[in-house]
Amino acid sequence: MDKHHHQHLLLQHHQHLHHHQKLSLAKSSRQSCSEWIFRDVPSDITIEVNGGNFALHKFPLVSRSGRIRRIVAEHRDSDISKVELLNLPGGAETFELAAKFCYGINFEITSSNVAQLFCVSDYLEMTEEYSKDNLASRTEEYLESIVCKNLEMCVQVLKQSEILLPLADELNIIGRCIDAIASKACAEQIASSFSRLEYSSSGRLHMSRQVKSSGDGGDWWIEDLSVLRIDLYQRVMNAMKCRGVRPESIGASLVSYAERELTKRSEHEQTIVETIVTLLPVENLVVPISFLFGLLRRAVILDTSVSCRLDLERRLGSQLDMATLDDLLIPSFRHAGDTLFDIDTVHRILVNFSQQGGDDSEDEESVFECDSPHSPSQTAMFKVAKLVDSYLAEIAPDANLDLSKFLLIAEALPPHARTLHDGLYRAIDLYLKAHQGLSDSDKKKLSKLIDFQKLSQEAGAHAAQNERLPLQSIVQVLYFEQLKLRSSLCSSYSDEEPKPKQQQQQSWRINSGALSATMSPKDNYASLRRENRELKLELARLRMRLNDLEKEHICMKRDMQRSHSRKFMSSFSKKMGKLSFFGHSSSRGSSSPSKQSFRTDSKVLMERTCASTD
């Protein structure tokens, strides 16, 4: 009750203030009129405008205003003494200026009052038909010769015209100011472009690449336009696009306008967001991607039209490689029990990213197969893959996240998008840790997403001991670890003897985990455990073997260095013998010890090599 009573008192207070303002306006109007009307001639007509009364004389008014002349003529018999002018544009303040003009009182026409005076001259019919150099022609001249030559004045007139619609539009005040703004902005940019032209050392004319501060590129008008109402701002932007203003300038203006208007609470927020989205240039990267994500968040909160959100999602998908993890974390505002973040919106953005340039999909695949990491499409794909894996890891602990939605995000990119599956494995492990009640079939669905051959050594070692993974997946990890170790052995020691037949058979007998359909689940489980133990033993043996080979490889390098030094000394002695001062050549005698020494060293090396391979 106290709250409602307080609101009632506030309402009464506002009504009292509004009534007091009307009385003050009427009183001030009467006081101001008494300062410039004919004091020695009594008033014969009272004009009422929005609650304000003006005690005036018929003759000055009817000599300039066709409307008042007609009203007085229609009531000549009754000798009318009071006229109420309803819906007069600009209100009492503007009428006072028009009345002064009728009385020949000088006042200044400015960009702050020209729109009101232009409209009131039309309302009162103050045209050349009734008097030469009337108010209509005076305001027309000022608008055309002064306002339309200056961009800031045009913006100010548009701002003043907001309360004069639709009359200001019908009188073409709005249209002329918008055209003037677009023309001036385009001319400023052309002039700025010419100012950046310079001659190179070769004498050719080119555009300077010097980065200029804000306002030096003919974009100083951006802040000025932010004061306009959204409907007029939209018309100005469309006119600028038609005139050829740079997309970067349009984008910068949209960012400035959104930062000004969307930071304050307004009932027109939804309209503002939807309008800004329609005004976005078609070119990419003309506005920051964080700005687009901010618009999308507002669009979700304000429940804008479907077309607005789909347009934003399409734009974001086309430049998703520029996004960060914070950009993707769009809060969900639907209902209780839903996920913390909006998964469906992110999925649609990923679909847009995957489908962009669909006509070039074959070319992309061919480039990928040719292993060209410098391809821009590949670079973008790899960046987005890392971003998606980070996003999956962020949303994985959410208890309300269904497996189907997790799979939806994880499978949104093509298989070749990930060259390394460490990030995906980490996200899946976090999901398994947070959702321990998953069935074995659900765990297998998650594990199938991972290509265990694309795990790093650290991730593979972690996965081999991860009890949250299905046993079949652990077997696959161990199997691929075995293959990697064998490959490492072959590359580090190319002269290794062929593998024993029994070892080869054992390696190939351990398959990738595919189980026979004819075996019972109990036998399958026992078989997997057995293969798991065998793989672990095999891996342990291979690691020991690899360590031994690395040690022997170091010893062999030392022996080779020693052998090389002995061979060098022998060759040096041989050459010195040929250069004997006595003129005798005993090459046979001098070379034989050298050869014998080399044979001895080679024999030692071969024995060590054979011993190491055994």
From Swiss-Prot:
Modified residues (Phosphotyrosine): 425
Compositional bias segments (type: Low complexity): 583-597
Metabolic or biological pathway: Protein modification; protein ubiquitination
UniProt record, GO biological process: protein ubiquitination
Pfam families: BTB, NPH3
Alphabetized SUPFAM superfamilies for the sequence: POZ domain
Domain BTB intervals: 43-111
Domain NPH3: 219-484
Classification via InterPro entries: BTB/POZ_dom, NPH3/RPT2-like, NPH3_dom, SKP1/BTB/POZ_sf
Region entry Disordered, spans: 492-525, 583-614
Polar residues: bias regions: 507-521
Coiled-coil annotated spans: 522-562
Keywords attached to this entry: Coiled coil, Phosphoprotein, Ubl conjugation pathway
Function: May act as a substrate-specific adapter of an E3 ubiquitin-protein ligase complex (CUL3-RBX1-BTB) which mediates the ubiquitination and subsequent proteasomal degradation of target proteins.
Family: Belongs to the NPH3 family.
Domain notes: The BTB/POZ domain mediates the interaction with some component of ubiquitin ligase complexes.
Listed name of the protein: BTB/POZ domain-containing protein At5g48800
Annotated source species: Arabidopsis thaliana (Mouse-ear cress)
